[in-house]
UniProtKB/Swiss-Prot annotation:
<dbReference type="InterPro" id="IPR036100">
    <property type="entry name" value="QueA_sf"/>
</dbReference>
<keyword id="KW-0963">Cytoplasm</keyword>
<comment type="function">
    <text>Transfers and isomerizes the ribose moiety from AdoMet to the 7-aminomethyl group of 7-deazaguanine (preQ1-tRNA) to give epoxyqueuosine (oQ-tRNA).</text>
</comment>
<protein>
    <recommendedName>
        <fullName>S-adenosylmethionine:tRNA ribosyltransferase-isomerase</fullName>
        <ecNumber>2.4.99.17</ecNumber>
    </recommendedName>
</protein>
<comment type="subunit">
    <text>Monomer.</text>
</comment>
<comment type="pathway">
    <text>tRNA modification; tRNA-queuosine biosynthesis.</text>
</comment>
<keyword id="KW-0949">S-adenosyl-L-methionine</keyword>
<dbReference type="InterPro" id="IPR042118">
    <property type="entry name" value="QueA_dom1"/>
</dbReference>
<keyword id="KW-0808">Transferase</keyword>
<dbReference type="GO" id="GO:0002099">
    <property type="term" value="P:tRNA wobble guanine modification"/>
</dbReference>
<dbReference type="InterPro" id="IPR003699">
    <property type="entry name" value="QueA"/>
</dbReference>
<dbReference type="GO" id="GO:0008616">
    <property type="term" value="P:queuosine biosynthetic process"/>
</dbReference>
<dbReference type="Pfam" id="PF02547">
    <property type="entry name" value="Queuosine_synth"/>
</dbReference>
<dbReference type="InterPro" id="IPR042119">
    <property type="entry name" value="QueA_dom2"/>
</dbReference>
<comment type="similarity">
    <text>Belongs to the QueA family.</text>
</comment>
<keyword id="KW-0671">Queuosine biosynthesis</keyword>
<dbReference type="GO" id="GO:0005737">
    <property type="term" value="C:cytoplasm"/>
</dbReference>
Length: 353
């Protein structure tokens, strides 16, 4: 298929710039096989039933945006595996070493070996790659990289959120209420609509919940640049499924209960690990690229926000719910003035049979 097959006209005013006042008061579009139902998100309880299994991504967004000086900013992309360690400096003090990939703006102002100081901590540019990507080394005085980012970093809101300045409330609202494993540089946004109250009400109804981890990388915002979509190379992201979670999911599959992925990140994690209809536990990296024709093994329903034209995520939902159906659904959502992207509204999709 061609990239242009996944294009549609999106009015810019539908790109949500701020979260709605209450998480669960965003709109929810139910896209069953028979009809569309537009409701409020808190009514999702009415569309799930006893025995359903909701699978959330529990990754937590880190403050991944750093200002190296007044003219250069970087957005962390991914922690580089097997490279972090603790050592001692010349004075015998404990020093934390950590390596990450990042995207710099403007990258042309940086060269390998440049050093930037944050009090008694240091960032070193170790490598320059293409498309503004760099590799960096953290040398931190007796704190972890996440403690450093909490102190010096900013919440990495997407570029399409165009505000004069960040808001303190973003630290809370660009984070799911259940996130507890640090590592994402962008939010798994389908989960932003959930409150603890809704989760508790779902559990009381007999809906089961489970958690996987996928640390969202900055590559999630990278555009597809090849007209032949099969030539597109996906970024890799770290995933983890515990043995306990795998057992819960496989039991639900065996009992033919519905498995609902909360977000494309949960879906990509589950389908990446699926072999012969079962989920396998473990830590792994995925670069799965889901396009129409993909054979889904695990997920029956998908809760997700509305995605960019010509994006890999719009291709994913077309693969899941049907190419023609998704174009029709998005046309309806635009006519209904639904809000798009990270702080926008949600839709509940059923897998195409």
């Amino acid at each position: 298929m061609k990239l242009s097959d996944f294009d549609f006209d999106l009015p810019l005013e539908l790109i949500a710039q701020n979260p709605i006042s209450k998480r669960d008061e965003s709109n929810l579009l139910i896209a069953s096989t028979q009809q569309y139902v537009k409701t409020k998100f808190y009514n999702i309880i009415d569309y799930l039933k006893e025995g359903d299994l909701l699978v959330f991504n529990n990754s937590k967004v880190i403050k991944a945006k750093l200002s190296l000086d007044k003219n250069i900013t970087i957005n962390l992309n991914q922690r580089l595996k097997d490279n972090r360690r603790a050592t001692n400096d010349d004075a015998g003090r404990l020093k934390s070493i950590d390596y990450w990939s990042a995207f710099a703006k403007p990258a042309r102002k940086l060269k390998v070996g440049d050093e930037f100081y944050f009090d008694n901590h240091k960032i070193i540019i170790t490598e320059k790659l293409e498309m503004g990507e760099i590799k960096i080394k953290f040398e931190l005085a007796n704190i972890s990289v996440f403690e450093f980012l909490d102190k010096y970093g900013e919440m990495p809101l997407p570029l399409y959120i165009k505000r004069p300045e960040r808001q303190k409330s973003d630290d809370e609202r660009y984070q799911t209420v259940y996130s507890n494993i640090q590592g994402s540089v962008a939010a798994p946004t389908a989960g932003l609509h959930f409150t603890n109250d809704i989760i508790n009400k779902l559990k009381a109804k007999g809906v089961q919940v489970a958690f996987v981890t996928l640390h969202v990388g900055a590559g999630t915002f990278m555009p597809v640049k090849t007209e032949n979509i099969n030539e597109h190379k996906m970024h890799t992201e770290y995933c983890s499924i515990t043995p306990e979670t795998a057992a819960i999911i496989n039991k639900a599959k065996k009992e033919k209960r519905r498995i609902i992925a909360v977000g494309t990140t949960s879906l990509r994690t589950l389908e990446s690990s699926g072999i012969n209809g079962n989920v396998n536990s473990g830590d792994f990296e995925t670069d799965i690229f889901i396009t129409p024709g993909f054979k889904f093994q695990i997920v029956d329903m998908l809760l997700t926000n509305f995605h960019f034209p010509k994006s890999t995520l719009f291709m994913l939902v077309c693969a899941f719910a049907g190419f023609k159906k998704m174009h029709e659904l998005y046309k309806y959502a635009i006519e209904e003035q639904m809000r798009f992207f990270s702080y926008g509204d949600a839709t509940l999709l059923y897998r195409k049979v």
